[in-house]
């Protein structure tokens, strides 16, 4: 019997409009009423992960920023893994000649050292790929724009850094350079970004730690995702690892099975077929 369902957000639980569909929300509530836990595993910050959950009337524990921070269902932080200051310095140095946009996720929210005009241009050309439910002004309000010289003067704790560029080829080159940074995990959630965390801050590791705290075995877990930053949890030896129908090929090859795309309530379909029948029979 499945006791824990770990679900990515963007491209997975959320539809193309950036919202939890009525069907997904209904099926998740049915699952929770049967005693099965929902664990959100997302690249978003905790605050940004809560927005669509609250809109849908759902509550869940949340692994955020690709595993850099974990919150329980009451909103209490129960785990965090920061990037070291030397890692952040090396990341900035590796990317300094590539004309990238940085999104630094910190204990004080998101900040960037980009010029605002360049930032807005990337948004307007769909390079920034913000959360679908946000307008430019909504995204702009999330960020503090810092002069480059102030980045290391504010005593910030860095949890995740997104490196954004319109050219996948440029990002491929940066990925190779960044491999030289010790202890760095490199993932991606889109063709125009790299997502950087400490190597101990990955969705799979955070999922394993959460399950251990809850005394849930790996054969009692189902995980669902769509992009490269879900690989660490979909490559785990769980009862079910499920790729969305819209998932990238690497994820489809990694997962044990495949569900419908996020535009067709793929999370609900997976839960209805792999979780609810057995939860019902166990009552």
Question: Could you say what each language-model-derived stretch is?
Answer:
Residues 1-4, 15, 20-21, 179, ...:
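Mg2+-dependent phosphoryl-transfer enzymes with acidic/Ser/Thr/Gly-rich catalytic loops
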Residues 3-8, 40:
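Short, hydrophobic/glycine-enriched beta-strand segments
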Residues 22-127:
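Active-site phosphate-binding/coordination module
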Residues 24, 49-53, 174, 251, ...:
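Hydrophobic packing residues within well-ordered alpha-helices of enzyme cores
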Residues 31, 42, 66, 161, ...:
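Residue-level signal for inorganic ion chemistry
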Residues 35-39, 59-60, 160, 219-221, ...:
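Short active-site oxyanion
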Residues 94, 98, 105-224:
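Conserved acidic, metal-coordinating active-site core of Asp-based
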């Amino acid at each position: 019997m499945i006791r824990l369902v770990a679900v990515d957000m963007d491209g997975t639980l959320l539809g193309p409009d950036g919202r939890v569909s009525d069907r997904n929300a209904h099926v998740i509530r049915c699952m929770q009423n049967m005693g099965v836990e929902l664990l959100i595993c997302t690249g978003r910050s905790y605050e940004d992960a809560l927005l669509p959950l609250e809109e849908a009337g759902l509550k869940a524990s949340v692994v955020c920023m690709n595993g850099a921070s974990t919150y329980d269902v009451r909103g209490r932080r129960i785990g965090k893994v920061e990037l070291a200051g030397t890692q952040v310095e090396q990341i900035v140095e590796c990317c300094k000649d590539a004309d990238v946009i940085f999104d630094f996720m910190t204990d004080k929210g998101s900040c960037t050292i980009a010029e605002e005009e360049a930032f807005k241009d990337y948004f307007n050309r769909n390079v920034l790929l913000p959360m679908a439910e946000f307008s430019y002004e909504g995204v702009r309000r999330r960020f503090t724009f810092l002069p480059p010289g102030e980045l290391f003067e504010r005593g910030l704790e860095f949890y995740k850094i997104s490196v954004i560029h319109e050219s996948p080829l440029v990002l491929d080159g940066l990925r190779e350079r960044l491999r030289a940074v010790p202890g760095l995990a490199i993932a991606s959630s889109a063709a125009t970004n790299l997502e950087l965390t400490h190597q101990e801050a990955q969705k799979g590791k955070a999922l394993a730690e959460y399950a251990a705290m809850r005394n849930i075995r790996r054969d009692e877990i189902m995980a669902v995702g769509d992009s490269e930053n879900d690989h660490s949890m979909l490559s785990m030896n769980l009862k079910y690892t499920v790729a969305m129908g819209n998932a990238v090929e690497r994820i489809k090859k990694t997962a044990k099975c495949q569900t419908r795309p996020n535009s067709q309530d793929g999370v609900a379909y997976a839960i209805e077929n792999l979780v609810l029948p057995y939860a019902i029979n166990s009552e």
